[in-house]
Amino acid sequence: MGTPESSREPCPDRILDDVGGAFAMGAVGGSAYHLIRGIYNSPGGARLSGGVQALRMSGPRSGGSFSVWGGLYSTFDCALVYARQKEDPWNSILSGAATGGFLSLRQGLGASARSALVGGVLLAMIEGVGIMLNKVQSTAHNEQFMEDHAATSLPYGMGQISGQSVPVPETSSSSSGSVSWFGSLFKKKKETEDHHSESRTHILESFDAPPVPTYEFK
């Protein structure tokens, strides 16, 4: 079964990929958040300008914070991949915990431990949801494949459920009615023409042909 790690970039390129994706996500999400917050906190008559100013001041900073987090996370992830020589959800969980703890070292060991716990739990939830979604998708795909294979391998009609009729292609009643009406009309016209031709032939055959004159003198 495929895991979310199997679809990611290789380790040297993974760091740059995650840094760029995290910066874009932080810039877009942070800009929207700070714009709404600036509009809400600004006085009446200057809400839009206050929101735009808050966006310009704090939007790029949010993107930078997210990019730093993404870069550290990918660095720890690649280090664990090379150390353990395999990729599994434990790499992501341990990388999230290490990233959270490393970013909070300036606040003390207690804050660093709490941040590491939060990061590990958050990544564990994300990995669990990803594994569940992959499992559900693979199960549905396998069931659909088995149904299609069974339907194609059975003879015609044996794959039908008891009491279920074999689907018959539907035809339009109006088109069939018009076709039958035109068909009956042309059939009647053809029968009438055939009747007239037969009567004409019968009349012509009823007259005997005149004898051919001979010019022999007796």
Swiss-Prot record:
GO CC, alphabetical: TIM23 mitochondrial import inner membrane translocase complex
Protein's UniProt keywords contain Mitochondrion: yes
Bilayer topology term: Multi-pass membrane protein
Record localization: Mitochondrion inner membrane
Keywords: Membrane, Mitochondrion, Mitochondrion inner membrane, Transmembrane, Transmembrane helix
Tissue: Expressed in flowers, leaves and cotyledons, and at very low levels in roots.
Induction: Up-regulated after antimycin A or rotenone treatments.
Chain segments annotated as transmembrane: 19-36, 66-82, 89-105, 116-133
Main location: mitochondrion
Family per record: Belongs to the Tim17/Tim22/Tim23 family.
Function statement: Essential component of the TIM17:23 complex, a complex that mediates the translocation of transit peptide-containing proteins across the mitochondrial inner membrane. Links the inner and outer membranes.
Name by which UniProt lists this protein: Mitochondrial import inner membrane translocase subunit TIM17-1
Natural source organism: Arabidopsis thaliana (Mouse-ear cress)
Lineage: Eukaryota, Viridiplantae, Streptophyta, Embryophyta, Tracheophyta
